[in-house]
Amino acid sequence: VNTLPRLLTGMTVVCLPLAAAHAQHLERAAEGIDCAHVTSTMESDLCTSDRASDADVLLNTTYKQARHQLQQQAANGSCTHCGAAEQQLIEAQRAWIQLRDKDCDAVYAFNADGTSRNGAKMHCLTTHAQDRTRQLRDFYEL
């Protein structure tokens, strides 16, 4: 079996989203914003938004890797239930997205009267994405 196409697909799934995330950081630097030392609410919001985006990129990459692994194991016959497992993973991810959104909307509402509301929501999104990424890596041994 030729593994080169699978390797290239896997590399594409990982590298393209990471390149986009790196471009965001370069954009902040070009704007003169140092996310390690923010000086305004606007800068803080931009930086926390970037962190949430980075976490989301990593989560999406990990999710695609899990699906790809299930598809490959189903195709080569090493896992007789991987087709069904992939469908269940898709449904679980959709349900998780709804949970995350509702949870982070609640965090935003709780902080709605202050200037930290956007940052609080972005922090919530980041934390959820990081937790889900860890779960997928653990569950699917990625």
Regions picked out by a protein language model, each given a short descriptive name:
Residues 1-11:
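Bacterial N-terminal signal peptides that target proteins for export
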Residues 11-14, 139:
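Short, leucine/isoleucine-rich alpha-helical interaction segments at C-terminal helix-coil junctions
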Residues 22-142:
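N-terminal alpha-helical modules
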Residues 13-21:
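Hydrophobic h-region of N-terminal signal peptides that target proteins for export
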